[in-house]
């Protein structure tokens, strides 16, 4: 049985369709004082999968998730698997300053305490967050789904570019699937007050060096896990355009996209902005339903 929270109802419906499983309806609403009402409509199976992202508004979506998990256990579910495509607070995985809350740890404890028996997510920003759980966890990569989308849209070998070294493993993963070249951008200090972002020379799969000259005339795809304000992406788009890329498309798993990020990315020269549906956005063109269904089948 699949149950979708209000943040992930469409995704839950597609997962249920992939698995040919029952989809249980959840009624949610707010009382006049702002408190949340939740009711599960239907008989509950022994094993239930809840799908609910906890992006903006994070606190509301998290509370709904906790209500769902606890309610399902009260209603007789023996096992509750929790799929959180995007986990809010996951970037607050450590104490940066004295007195700060380690919010990711608190959220993990809340999910477990509510009664979750298993936790599944996608491309969590800091993998150490999974260590906060004492229940089985799975961190699915969405790069296969993104690679499939890219492959269907173009008829030539693209160049996959990570906007920084941290995102390079994502670019490598997609490039391996598509059998194409990849590289990343890096900031090079030229003097006390001068920093320049450049393409990093890397050895390609054909033993040829991927460098600045490799960009000219290519369809470039920038790959990252999360785009929030988009500053790094805007910079990457501009650089690739300057280097002569035929087109620049931007892809990510989690489209947070705050402070006008989408508009600024397009203004920089991006051909398109593509993301998964871990969060609901205009860019959400890559479905995670098959990836979730494959894990649930195991």
From Swiss-Prot:
EC number per UniProt: 2.7.6.1
Any Gene Ontology biological process: 5-phosphoribose 1-diphosphate biosynthetic process
Coiled-coil blocks: none
Residue sites binding Mg(2+) 1 per the record: 125
An annotated Gene Ontology molecular function: ATP binding
InterPro entries membership: Pribosyltran_N, PRibTrfase_dom, PRTase-like, Rib-P_diPkinase, Rib-P_diPkinase_arc
Residues at which D-ribose 5-phosphate binds: 189, 224
GO cellular component terms listed in the entry, alphabetical order: cytoplasm; ribose phosphate diphosphokinase complex
Record keywords: ATP-binding, Cytoplasm, Kinase, Magnesium, Metal-binding, Nucleotide biosynthesis, Nucleotide-binding, Transferase
Cofactor: Mg(2+)
Residues that bind ATP: 33-35, 91-92
Pathway assigned in UniProt: Metabolic intermediate biosynthesis; 5-phospho-alpha-D-ribose 1-diphosphate biosynthesis; 5-phospho-alpha-D-ribose 1-diphosphate from D-ribose 5-phosphate (route I): step 1/1
Catalysed transformations (reactions): D-ribose 5-phosphate + ATP = 5-phospho-alpha-D-ribose 1-diphosphate + AMP + H(+)
Gene3D superfamilies: 3.40.50.2020
Chain residues that bind Mg(2+) 2: 164
The keyword Plastid is annotated on this UniProt entry: no
Function: Involved in the biosynthesis of the central metabolite phospho-alpha-D-ribosyl-1-pyrophosphate (PRPP) via the transfer of pyrophosphoryl group from ATP to 1-hydroxyl of ribose-5-phosphate (Rib-5-P).
NCBIfam families, per database record: PRK00934.1, ribP_PPkin
HAMAP family referenced in this protein's UniProt entry, alphabetically: RibP_PPkinase_A
Family: Belongs to the ribose-phosphate pyrophosphokinase family. Class III (archaeal) subfamily.
This protein's name: Ribose-phosphate pyrophosphokinase
Protein species of origin: Methanobrevibacter smithii (strain ATCC 35061 / DSM 861 / OCM 144 / PS)
